Amino acid sequence: MARGLRTAGHDVTIVSRHPGYVPSKAIAWDGVRAAMPETDAIVNLAGEPLADGRWTAARKAEIVASRVDATRVVVDAIAASPGRARVLVNASAVGFYGASGDAPLDETAPAGHDFLASACARWEAAAWPAKDHDVRVVVLRIGVVLGPDGGALGKMVIPFRAGVGGRLGSGKQWMSWIHRDDVVGLVLAALGNTAYAGAVNATAPSPVRNRDFTQA
């Protein structure tokens, strides 16, 4: 993401829990407020990876807190520097909708009722107050991100390379996916085009069933 933004001409500062290990301009989370007067736009993708470990009660709490707390830090920093940042592009996920069977879903569909849906709804709720400070808020409900050298695909191919991969259950589950490069392109579009506002589904036009994806 940072590489794509720089290529497009943006001056990027990365926010990290370990800025000393980032090979580019970076600050810690406690420096976000101080950096805000020099900031025109914010892209907030922060959150613990979903696939790293079992979903124990503690792990679920960490998944939610890492997203909600980071977003609150950003919005609080925006509130402390009114009139500076013009747009916040905040990540969410298609998990917002929960299990919906074969029903098509657009951005007006309500949140689901499972854990991921609740987590996404709380994540988004933490971002919307930035609108109170004349900031255009774009919430990207991102699908499963695929790329040749990382993203979800990197973890998915491991069991297949070991000869034990296969579909999940019936394999009828829909998977809304998006290529990593398209996520970058969508973020760039959201930053530069004021027509982007509110929730936006960040997925490829045609989802696939799990059985078809695993066969591919």
PLM regions with names:
Residues 1-10:
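N-terminal Rossmann NAD(P)H-binding glycine-rich loop of SDR-like oxidoreductase domains
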Residues 20-73:
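NAD(P)H-binding glycine-rich loop region in Rossmannoid oxidoreductase-like domains
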Residues 65, 69, 101-139:
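Catalytic helix-loop patch of NAD(P)-dependent Rossmann-fold dehydrogenases
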Residues 72-114:
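Conserved Rossmann-fold NAD(P)-dependent oxidoreductase catalytic core, especially the SDR/UDP-sugar
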Residues 121, 130-139, 143-175, 180:
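NAD(P)-dependent short-chain dehydrogenase/reductase
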Residues 193-216:
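Mid/C-terminal beta-alpha module of Rossmann-like enzyme folds, strongest
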